[in-house]
Amino acid sequence: MVNVVLGSQWGDEGKGKLVDLLVGKYDIVARCAGGNNAGHTIVVNGVKYDFHMLPSGLVNPNCQNLLGNGVVIHVPSFFKELETLEAKGLKNARSRLFVSSRAHLVFDFHQVTDKLRELELSGRSKDGKNIGTTGKGIGPTYSTKASRSGLRVHHLVNDQPGAWEEFVARYKRLLETRRQRYGDFEYDFEAKPAEYKKLREQLKPFVVDSVVFMHNAIEAKKKILVEGANALMLDIDFGTYPYVTSSNTGIGGVLTGLGIPPRTIDEIYGVVKAYTTRVGEGPFPTEQLNENGEKLQTIGAEFGVTTGRKRRCGWLDLVVLKYSTLINGYTSLNITKLDVLDTFKEIPVGISYSIQGKKLDLFPEDLNILGKVEVEYKVLPGWDQDITKITKYEDLPENAKKYLKYIEDFVGVPVEWVGTGPARESMLHKEIK
């Protein structure tokens, strides 16, 4: 059994909380894409654990965790995050954590060039806007992967004669191509290979052939949960390109990032914030640059875990959600942070786009069009009631249930979970047929 948790908007929907809720039922939690460029916090027994690269399944002492071949790994950050979690009391994490031998490596010079590239792009653009990268080197690493010049985990841990010398030579060539492209930036070449020679010994016990790992688990009928990173609207192919991340963050990335066939997937859970947020630049049709946006940001505490940046806020965009559903094929939804809407008298939701009076059939791929669309809203009544103490779906205010029902009917997917507060237990389950 393989079930998948995916973000349906622009990230920060609360995927980690759903994974945290579900993880006790699973034998394995796997990540399939991205790196340490996103983050979420899980609270267990009053202890806060911040996850950026590592799978959230580490909070379950009986769960194995895998970083798949589609993940890109900055090895120093891998160990720093692991040590931070261990310092907070996470037990036997090292024996339950595995890394794909096919995963690509992020180096410090990738991070340097990530920031240089961002400055370059903002200087070229007419409005001075940039992509909004986290500066973690994710994009440049995927670039070297696509150009077939990158280094993978197996290159680092290979014990064969001459393998280390080959690693250093390839590392040097990779660095030189960056310098040719961006000029002679400050970087201690001599120190870095020496650092990685130490890290390779530390990393070896974690490394597995992830294809064998996953298929053995599937054959053994293990319960597997895939933890998606980022969200569909940040997908390199289907998101608001170029204001996207550098990997496939939808269901396609699950298959290629873990090496599993489509027939192994059972349930696909789409996580949807009850309103919409976005970090960084790029079109955002339902954004509210007014008191409503500020209110959503304040009540929702909308600041990024990884970057600390303020998130832009707006109303729920059902055009985005329907498009996301078409691609990812959600079998049920988790609506998060519904409580943030508690004090709004009226709650608009975006239901269609038009441009120059002509309604669009679907979410447009052209950002010149997307940036000019007019949004048609359906205004739904608020419930003006604190829902954070409610423990059963049936006890939600009628208008809150109507809000959820409207979402279900619009996208044709049932809501299975509803987030009603920041606490770990503030998640209502609704039976679905």
From Swiss-Prot:
Annotated keywords: Cytoplasm, GTP-binding, Ligase, Magnesium, Metal-binding, Nucleotide-binding, Purine biosynthesis
InterPro entries hit by this protein: Adenylosuccin_syn_GTP-bd (IPR018220), Adenylosuccin_syn_Lys_AS (IPR033128), Adenylosuccinate_synth_dom1 (IPR042109), Adenylosuccinate_synth_dom2 (IPR042110), Adenylosuccinate_synth_dom3 (IPR042111), Adenylosuccinate_synthetase (IPR001114), P-loop_NTPase (IPR027417)
Matching SUPFAM superfamilies: P-loop containing nucleoside triphosphate hydrolases
List of residues binding substrate: 305-311
Co-factor binding comment: Binds 1 Mg(2+) ion per subunit.
Record-level GO cellular component terms: cytoplasm
Pathway terms, separated by semicolons: Purine metabolism; AMP biosynthesis via de novo pathway; AMP from IMP: step 1/2
Active site: 12, 40
Cofactor needs: Mg(2+)
Binding site for GTP: 11-17, 39-41, 311, 337-339, 419-421
GO molecular function, one term: adenylosuccinate synthase activity
EC number: 6.3.4.4
Origin superkingdom: Eukaryota
Subcellular localization, as worded in the UniProt entry: Cytoplasm
Protein name: Adenylosuccinate synthetase
One Pfam family recorded for the sequence: Adenylsucc_synt
Residues holding IMP: 12-15, 37-40, 134, 148, 230, 245, 309
GO biological process entries: 'de novo' AMP biosynthetic process; IMP metabolic process
Family: Belongs to the adenylosuccinate synthetase family.
Binding site for Mg(2+): 12, 39
Subunit architecture: Homodimer.
Chain's role: Plays an important role in the de novo pathway and in the salvage pathway of purine nucleotide biosynthesis. Catalyzes the first committed step in the biosynthesis of AMP from IMP.
UniProt xrefs under PROSITE patterns: ADENYLOSUCCIN_SYN_1, ADENYLOSUCCIN_SYN_2
Reactions listed under catalytic activity: IMP + L-aspartate + GTP = N(6)-(1,2-dicarboxyethyl)-AMP + GDP + phosphate + 2 H(+)
